[in-house]
Amino acid sequence: SRRILILGAAGRDFHNFNLVYRDDAAVEVAAFTAAQIPGIAGRRYPPELAGPLYPQGIPIVDEQELAALLQRERVQQVVFAYSDVTHAHVMHLASIALAQGADFLLLGPERTQLQSRLPVIAVSAVRTGCGKSQTARWLSRLLKQQGRQVAVIRHPMPYGDLAQQAVQRFAARADLDAA
């Protein structure tokens, strides 16, 4: 099997893993890396979410250990799976991967976007703090005023127990309080 490492920030990396690699027996995900969010490194992506190919879960390692991790784990391919960084930062990570003999990959939208039979509006931005949540709330209110049914989907986030939060539905403010 091909050994890969997923560079992430505890969100899109998990999403990409779930959609592309979770059930692929030809691939072994050696680890996720953690960047941007403190307190994530040292944890594991839980086996309940990682699936039967990963009965011990998947380690989450600090991105600063990238070069050593690639050598130690004999990683053949590095998959970049987060945003909010400059082109120069992405290319720096690519250079580290290539210097260690690994391929560097960005997954395209055909493999990572959720399929829907309904119309979809994506709210994205170049970095954290740009107002994605506020924009999504504004759009939701506008669409509801037009009589449409609205649902908001977000990729997994690392706050709390990932296994217990595998699927969360917030239909009312009380649902937020219960979470």
PLM feature spans:
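Phosphate-binding P-loop
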Residues: 112-118
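Glycine-rich phosphate-binding P-loop
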Residues: 122-139
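ATP-dependent carboxylate-amine ligase catalytic core
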Residues: 142-179
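N-terminal beta-loop-helix "entrance" segment that forms/cooperates
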Residues: 37-57, 161-167
